[in-house]
């Protein structure tokens, strides 16, 4: 995002994360110093849309949350592995912004959400939820993946991500091979 300067940016190698429709997932980020009024937000996704049902328009919806929810005790601070009782991170809580659904484009694409105009706290979680794809089988022609990875240029982010489904929020490390 930017007003007078970039408050978070990362360059990346490709790391794709696929989740079933109805699951939000995204990155917790610590924003750079200075004003944190975000006007624009961009994220990258990859989608395969060749077998999407006729008349269906697959979409992505961006949400930005303050990390002011309950304390999450699911990561052990000593080992940085999920399942520990000592991590103490705050879960995403207050919804600060929700975009209109953006129509997906096949292949790799950068999606820009403009006219946000929200003041952000120092730590937020941004998520994307896909709709109109099933994500059951990569290569099925009806999947979408959020691109998560990177070297932080401005601000910072750990090697983990938040997932929200019907059971609530869970934190996973990017290197973890098992998600619920």
What are these model-predicted stretches?
Residues 18-33, 109-111:
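Short beta-strands within extracellular/lumenal beta-sheet-rich domains
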Residues 32-42, 121-123:
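Extended extracellular/luminal ectodomain segments enriched in beta-structured repeat modules
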Residues 42-53:
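Short amphipathic, basic-aromatic surface patches that mediate peripheral association
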Residues 1-18:
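Boundary/junction segments of secreted and surface-exposed precursor proteins
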Residues 26, 38-40, 113:
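Hydrophobic residues on conserved beta-strands that form the core of alpha/beta folds
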Residues 149-180:
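PGST-rich, cysteine-poor low-complexity/disordered linker and tail segments that act as flexible spacers
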Residues 53-157:
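Aromatic- and Gly/Pro-enriched, solvent-exposed loop/edge beta-strand patches characteristic
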